[in-house]
């Protein structure tokens, strides 16, 4: 079973305090595991044979609030999320994540479509686990690319700026744009490909890649979107 909240904070609060001092906001990966997580035997060859175990839940975050006050956390709530996980996130006012690259499959109720965003969320064009926006767009099948194009207003620029502008104009309270998208880079600049072990987390940019007027373009878009 998970350790009691007291045990956790007594051993980790000092380290957590140091992290909080150096960061504006932290993302909690696999947030659903704080409500329930999938436990498998250590000797299991696959993850098939396991069971759901109740996580530390609200007690942990209540204790962290006692120690640190307001928690500047973003809940990574991607994948299959239960009502109980949503309730835990909302109880503490943690924004969830909206990934625009996930927005164009399914119907009008797709939670990643901009029309379905809410203020208590963070919108991304894509994350470290996604392709770059340009790489993603070029890799789409023709029918899927047409679906994306149909959603975008005709006056939007081409990719990746169309998706960047869409993210900035979302109702989400915060928008995060990967550097690769701002530099208009393709799949060669992808940060991470889940399930693989080679070439990940190695991409770096150099200042000579940054166009002279990029700062002005970003400023104009953010101001027009009411984020300046």
Predicted features, each with a name:
Residues 1-16, 20:
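Single conserved hydrophobic/aromatic residue that forms the stacking wall/gate
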Residues 17-228:
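Active-site and adjacent substrate-binding regions of carbohydrate-active enzymes
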């Amino acid at each position: 079973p998970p350790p009691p909240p007291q045990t956790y904070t007594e051993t980790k609060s000092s380290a957590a305090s140091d992290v909080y001092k150096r960061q504006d906001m932290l993302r909690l990966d696999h947030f659903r595991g704080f409500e329930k997580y999938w436990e498998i035997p250590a000797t299991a060859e696959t993850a098939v044979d396991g069971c759901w175990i109740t996580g530390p839940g609200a007690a942990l975050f209540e204790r962290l609030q006692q120690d640190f006050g307001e928690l500047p956390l973003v809940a990574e709530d991607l994948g299959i999320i239960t009502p109980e996980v949503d309730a835990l996130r909302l109880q503490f006012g943690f924004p969830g994540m909206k990934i625009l690259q996930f927005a164009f499959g399914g119907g009008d109720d797709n939670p990643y479509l901009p029309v379905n965003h809410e203020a208590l969320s963070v919108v991304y064009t894509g994350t470290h686990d996604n392709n770059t926006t340009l790489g993603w767009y070029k890799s789409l099948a023709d029918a899927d690319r047409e679906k994306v194009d149909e959603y975008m207003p005709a006056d939007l620029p081409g990719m990746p700026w169309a998706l960047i502008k869409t993210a900035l104009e979302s109702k989400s309270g915060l928008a995060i744009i990967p550097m690769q998208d701002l530099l208009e880079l393709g799949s060669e600049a992808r940060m991470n490909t889940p399930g693989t072990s080679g070439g990940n987390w190695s991409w770096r940019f150099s200042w000579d890649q940054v166009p002279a007027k990029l700062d002005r373009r970003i400023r104009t878009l953010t101001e027009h979107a009411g984020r300046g």
